[in-house]
């Protein structure tokens, strides 16, 4: 049986986390040559490449499996052996969860457990991929099916409303939200792969993707600010703008129409006791504040 030296696995992990050999060497306090040598030893052991040497580097399928193994072992070692330093807990989460329910959910964990969070923000359609690559030990995703050797539980749903300020609505939709009016109304997306706004308009107004002018802003909080100041219309989780809706700073442009995103919590199996506490905290709070119907 091939048993890797965990020093070599840590070198592979550092190259992925630090997005290159130079920063990995600095992180491990060794030379770049030593980092390369350790990874080459690991590749020789398994008889195949474990790292695709692009910029930034990324692991091969076998490399992903080894990184997942390393992260599981680190969690289990922390549980049984303890440590003088907080354990790094890397999670892939979507920006809207981070802006709404996730941090309150993690409050008891951060208060009671010796951990350091490394939250990697990614669209909820792509967070599971980071878990598959071994970059994180847990992920909030819209995918209901678990990866091999992983566990999954349903958290609940975020309902997205199509909103704008009253002044924006008066300017762009004086006769209501129509197909022709939408073609002139500036919108906003999180990144070039964020298709929620386009999907909503295509489904409800038969507008083809790319037909609506759209800003790109990588911030959930900025969506709210842009909408409040009257410069865009956009899809925002109801949970994030309850106060703004109540005070009429924002209005629902299409009452009765919304986009629902069911969220799931994925993590490696078996869970350490520490990871089980993280799971319990996320599920307990998620079931309280997210839609369960």
UniProtKB/Swiss-Prot annotation:
Ranges for domain HTH lysR-type come to: 4-60
> One Pfam annotation, family name?
LysR_substrate
Q: Which InterPro entries match?
A: ArgP, ArgP_gammaproteobact, LTTR, LysR_subst-bd, Tscrpt_reg_HTH_LysR, WH-like_DNA-bd_sf, WH_DNA-bd_sf
Q: What is a single molecular function from GO for this protein? A: DNA binding
Alphabetical UniProt keywords: DNA-binding, Transcription, Transcription regulation
Family annotation (SUPFAM superfamilies) = Periplasmic binding protein-like II, Winged helix' DNA-binding domain
State how it assembles: Homodimer.
Q: Which NCBIfam families match?
A: argP (TIGR03298), PRK03635.1 (NF002964), PRK13348.1 (NF009888)
Reported function: Controls the transcription of genes involved in arginine and lysine metabolism.
Family listed = Belongs to the LysR transcriptional regulatory family.
Protein name according to UniProt: HTH-type transcriptional regulator ArgP
Q: Which organism is it from?
A: Sodalis glossinidius (strain morsitans)
């Amino acid at each position: 049986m091939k048993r890797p030296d965990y020093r070599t696995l840590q070198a592979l992990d550092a190259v992925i986390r630090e997005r290159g050999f130079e920063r990995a060497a600095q992180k491990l306090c060794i030379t770049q040559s030593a980092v390369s040598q350790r990874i080459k030893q690991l590749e020789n052991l398994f008889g195949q490449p474990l790292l695709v040497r692009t910029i930034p580097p990324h692991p091969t399928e076998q490399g992903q499996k080894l990184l997942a193994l390393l992260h599981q072992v680190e969690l289990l070692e922390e549980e049984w052996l303890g440590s003088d330093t907080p354990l790094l807990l890397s999670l892939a989460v979507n920006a809207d969860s981070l802006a709404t329910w996730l941090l309150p959910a993690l409050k008891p964990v951060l208060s009671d457990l010796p951990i350091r969070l490394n939250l990697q923000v990614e669209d909820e359609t792509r967070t599971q991929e980071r878990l598959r690559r071994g970059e994180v030990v847990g992920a909030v995703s819209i995918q209901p099916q678990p990866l091999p050797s992983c566990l999954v539980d349903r958290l609940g749903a975020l309902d997205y409303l199509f909103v704008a300020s009253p002044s924006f609505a008066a300017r762009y939709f004086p006769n209501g939200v129509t197909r022709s009016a939408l073609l002139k109304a500036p919108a906003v997306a999180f990144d070039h792969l964020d298709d929620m706004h386009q999907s909503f308009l295509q489904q409800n107004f038969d507008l083809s993707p790319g037909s609506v002018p759209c800003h790109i802003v990588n911030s959930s909080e900025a969506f709210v600010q842009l909408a409040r100041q009257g410069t865009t219309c956009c899809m925002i989780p109801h949970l994030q703008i309850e106060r703004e809706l109540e005070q009429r700073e924002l209005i629902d442009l299409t009452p009765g129409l919304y986009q629902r995103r069911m969220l799931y919590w994925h993590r490696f199996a078996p869970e350490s006791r520490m990871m089980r506490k993280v799971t319990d905290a996320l599920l307990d709070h998620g079931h309280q504040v997210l839609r369960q119907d």
